[in-house]
Regions:
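C-terminal accessory region of radical SAM enzymes
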Residues: 2-24, 49-96
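Residues immediately within or flanking Cys/His clusters that coordinate Zn2+
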Residues: 26, 85, 90, 136, ...
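Short, small/polar residue-rich loop motifs at catalytic or cofactor-binding pockets
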Residues: 29-32
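Short, ordered coil/turn segments that flank beta-strands lining enzyme active or ligand-binding pockets
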Residues: 39-40
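Hydrophobic "anchor" residues
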Residues: 43-44
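A short, well-structured catalytic beta-strand-centered motif of the EAL phosphodiesterase domain
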Residues: 47-48, 150
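Conserved alpha-helical substructure of the radical SAM core
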Residues: 56, 95-165
Length: 165
């Protein structure tokens, strides 16, 4: 039997919590259309694994273009375009949790979007993209955030290979 990961435990705890699950209809998140995150194992995601635990592929084994427009990547983008956000953990994603305030700039009401490129994506229901705007390389396990979705304090590498390099 496989031991559940910390991520599995957190997602189960959150699922059973009183954190509100907001309706995402009428909102658009640009993250899957503009952002990639690559961890030390080469796994690629569009955002934090605690917010969406779905990999698009692995750049160690797959061509970048294939990861960028993998079936999973396109399905995630489709779920944003149809308003379901079905791949997102609506209880851990701080962008979705910002809905009562009208979004956070990355997640916006569709009628508030001014970026023409994003408006074209929405209008044409584009799930394939030609390029990415931001790439975040997650080369070490340190984090300067005290994010309630995954930790209550900072994680700092103070010894070992990650610290020395």
């Amino acid at each position: 039997m496989n031991k559940p990961s910390n991520l599995d435990n957190i997602n189960e705890d959150v699922t059973n919590s009183d954190i509100p699950d907001f309706d995402t209809a009428g909102f658009f998140c640009s993250q899957p259309f503009t952002n990639l995150e690559v961890n030390t194992r080469g796994e690629v995601r569009t955002c934090c694994a605690y917010w969406m635990n779905q990999t698009l592929g692995n750049i160690t084994f797959d061509e970048t273009e294939n990861v960028l427009n993998s079936d999973t990547a396109q399905d995630i983008r489709k779920s944003i375009l149809d308003g379901s956000f079905s791949y997102c953990n609506k209880k851990t994603c701080p962008r979705i949790q910002s809905i009562p305030k009208g979004g956070d700039g990355i997640l916006q009401r569709i009628e508030d979007i001014e970026d023409q490129h994003l408006l074209d994506i929405i209008k044409n229901k584009e799930t394939k993209i030609d390029s990415i705007k931001y790439v975040n390389f997650l080369w070490d396990l340190s984090c300067n955030l005290r994010c309630p979705s995954c930790r209550v304090s900072t994680i700092l590498n103070t010894k070992g290979e990650a610290y020395e390099n």
